[in-house]
Amino acid sequence: MKLVAALCLFSISGATAFGNLPPSTSTSTSNRLQRTALFSSFGDTSNVEQPKPMAESKQRKKKLKTFNRYLEIESWKRGPAARDMEPILRSIGEACKQINRIVQRAQTDDFYGAAVDSDGNTLEDNIQGEVQQKLDVVCNKIMLKQFCGSSTGIISAVASEEEDVPRCCSDVMGDPAFSEGEYVAVFDPIDGSKNIDSSLPVGTIFGIYKCQPGKEVDEKTFLQKGNELIAAGYCLYSATTILVLTMGSGVDGFTLDPDKGNFFHTHEDMRIPSAGPIYSFNEANFHDFSEPVKRYLDALKTGSTSTGIRSNARYVGALVADTHNVLINGGIYGYPGTRTNEAGKLRLLYESNPMGMIMEQAGGAASTGVGRILDVTPTEIHMRVPTFLGSIDNVFELDQFHQYYSDD
């Protein structure tokens, strides 16, 4: 009945607007002009005011600092140490932009799938025993060049999750002038690279340490605890591209404007809730988890933890994406050890330490289940540790489950 009434109303209003048209196909000139004027006005937006949200967003962007401007201000506020970081962090911003462009073109420019040599043969597995993806190889080169080429005399060596051993910047750049520097960098060039085939989020993780004074830079230089990190951060390539950074006094986020090609300071002093509704674990491995972890996950699902929150599972399969979700909404990310692999999957230097520093600086916690991640002394550059990151109440309770329960 409503449809019939609407049609009748349209017929009446139409007759009023166009005149009482005869049943013939021809119309008077005046009627045609009336209809032309009426319909053409529908597409005329010259006098239409822009939606307020669009206008407000332009005004807001004018007030936001660019990433480079933020670094200038911070280097002025913090002194010499921050001034050393400025060219390094600028280079990281450029690396993230380059990787973002490659990620966006991965499907059209054939950057997905396993990496192959000039003869079309799949490359050997990397040091982690994983098949190297095309994206791994390309992004690793970008990170090497950006870190080592940021400025002579700052970064002396780099260690990549994709390479067997650390590399001197003089070797990367082919110039001995790049052999001297007070800092070393560690990074995972593309976290979750297999996600690219399915157009799912991926990320980049990095950390910067100071060299030990008076000692030659070698592999031992990199074997520092996470609490000695000078700076750490990640880039998330997803619906938006965001760079999250800490220099040891809080966490800030910068969103890439694809039109202007700049990162803007959109997230100031990021803080994780003390507890939250998200848990992010690969539950395909549930039956191989230790008893404390299994009991904790069961408690999360029923809301029978001390927080009283009944949690929701969210798991993308990329550390950066899953941890960022937890950082924003609260909860816990976990990659525990299993019965067959007690150390788990995540690398201490390239993944757990940088992400752990960010979580702690945002008011959260980072644990192995039995202790603070940032207090772990690495024994080799590709060392792995069980990793739990997130809201302080959630992570603390997981640690309690490890204390109260033991494997049967």
Residue map of PLM features:
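N-terminal chloroplast transit peptides
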Residues: M1-S26
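N-terminal leader/targeting signatures
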Residues: A6, G14, R35-L38, K63
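N-terminal mitochondrial targeting presequences
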Residues: A17, T25, Q34-D44
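Helix-loop segments that flank and shape redox-cofactor active sites
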Residues: A115-V116
